[in-house]
Amino acid sequence: AEVSKDDKDWNHAAEWDHAARFFWNTVVNHRSVCIGGNSVREHFHPSDNFTSMLNDVQGPETCNTYNMLRLTKMLYQNSGDVDNSNKPDPRYVDYYERALYNHILSSQEPDKGGFVYFTPMRPGHYRVYSQPETSMWCCVGSGLENHTKYGEFIYAHRQDTLYVNLFIPSQLNWKEQGVTLTQETLFPDDGKVTLRIDKASKKKLTLMIRIPGWAGSSKDYAITINGQKKKYAIRPGVSTYLPIHRK
């Protein structure tokens, strides 16, 4: 539903934003497991005791993660406006990446295309995939969308700044800025990422490359620009963006 500025509830937008961020922080930091999924049968267990999830034959539903990814994307898009920094918060991308690779990517059967409903956390357990005409779960409906969305969050932009969020082989054609960029990588099997600007106008451009919170210290990665190694200091464990300016 659309909300106009004449709507009496428009003034509550800040409250809604605060509530959404509180919910996101609670789920991601206190209710989620390593794959980025959460809950069993869409019910949270105690935040300080995951035993029931580890013992259950069911587990996080992919449609829960699907909705968390949607929320994450919206909060990311609005994050620079909330604190007036005009800078998106890369912490949202850290979670998006974790859930995308560890839960969503593994949720489709590679040969017959069935979709996973539950992803059990029980050690040594198995997953059940949907079958045509017998399995139309909620996670099948959202699953049809999940695997068409791998390209939608790789890049983002604000004004003349381009953000490289995810390390996925891709090509970007930014028509407004006259920039064509190619990304080559085998991530997560290999940590090397190559960004090549194939076409560029004379317009001012800032390239913001995400340094994930899991990247560790500066000793754990190296950056080469036009064949020359560059040194950048980062805080270990803190997700950030590394700026490269072209005037």
Give a label for each model feature.
Residues A1-K247:
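Glycan-recognition and catalytic cores of secretory/periplasmic carbohydrate-active enzymes
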